[in-house]
């Protein structure tokens, strides 16, 4: 009997891609394939690619070319495979298979077919699959953190975004399925669940006929996981019911990742997000009133076609006015297959980059000021790693999401994968510094009257 090839994975792109990678690893391991972290030692490398913007495609292509030049057999999975399909097989002889964004559950069959010499194109033209709690999964995050996908795909048609083409229409999992997987992850010792989809506030609309995020949060409140974090909350979906569920569910963090993209109504209309233009300010104000301790992250696009200096200043003032905790800014990237590529009045590349840098410079003192407000506080920190040279523990407080926000550098003994109370002693633009709380610190907290 011929031995099965050893497989390595190269993961690129977002956390949704990461979950796809984790399912492929789990499926292959269950089928008896050896999984090697070292690409050089593996017989086949599965590259789970990103194709969201030009820079991501370039990174994916560089990775593929480097592996091809080293003589590796390659399986191209993910968004680049979904985007370009047969073109990749034609241009990369080393590519033995393509696996689409809705086809990762077929990875074992794909590998078996390649072993007989077939070049496999396993791409559904309209991705429709979404994994549930029964599909094998091997997590690649730190032991205490897991991403939990509640839905896949998107029915919106924002002018700049190619995701509906790459990921298909929205399809939500059932509440029962999501809660079952959350319980599995809790049993593995996970301390933080990060809920993800393309638009998490629209969870359930396709399955139940109305958004069901509020009900999902309340159900997840019964799961023994200390932290539940919401990513990709479309601002107009933050209904009073959702806000109440966040406020009233003990393990749901008051942390909201809001992809606002811009502030000016004219640009939002051009982005095909017109309903957002006149409510951005009201939404932020309502959130801060209902959730005064909320941590707000957002992303913006600089240099969208037609963006004038007036539009740019409007966005800059919006950032100054609302003082977000975390802001990411991307220079607009024109994408084939989106409406924005044909819009008039494109902004020159150097202007886009300058505006991006200016917006980040606007945010930095705000971020540092908000971080410095943490100095002296006792906060829970999830310890995730140890610095190899200093011995400092590295973790995150509730105000920091994994991978996209800052970290907390902690002095003192603290077990990996556990929540530890830390006194914050210093702060900079992106990170906090602290020390494990003393017994006196904890006694002082226990003596404070309840604010409930």
Swiss-Prot record:
Gene (name only): rimO
Family label: Belongs to the methylthiotransferase family. RimO subfamily.
Free-text comment on the cofactor: Binds 2 [4Fe-4S] clusters. One cluster is coordinated with 3 cysteines and an exchangeable S-adenosyl-L-methionine.
Species for this entry: Synechococcus sp. (strain ATCC 27144 / PCC 6301 / SAUG 1402/1) (Anacystis nidulans)
Positions contributing to [4Fe-4S] cluster 1 binding: 14, 50, 79
Known function: Catalyzes the methylthiolation of an aspartic acid residue of ribosomal protein uS12.
Domain TRAM, residue spans: 372-438
GO annotations of cellular component type: cytosol
Annotated binding of [4Fe-4S] cluster 2, by residue: 154, 158, 161
EC code(s) of this entry: 2.8.4.4
Reaction it catalyzes: L-aspartate(89)-[ribosomal protein uS12]-hydrogen + (sulfur carrier)-SH + AH2 + 2 S-adenosyl-L-methionine = 3-methylsulfanyl-L-aspartate(89)-[ribosomal protein uS12]-hydrogen + (sulfur carrier)-H + 5'-deoxyadenosine + L-methionine + A + S-adenosyl-L-homocysteine + 2 H(+)
Superkingdom of source: Bacteria
Name of the protein in its database record: Ribosomal protein uS12 methylthiotransferase RimO
One GO molecular-function entry: 4 iron, 4 sulfur cluster binding
Location within or outside the cell: Cytoplasm
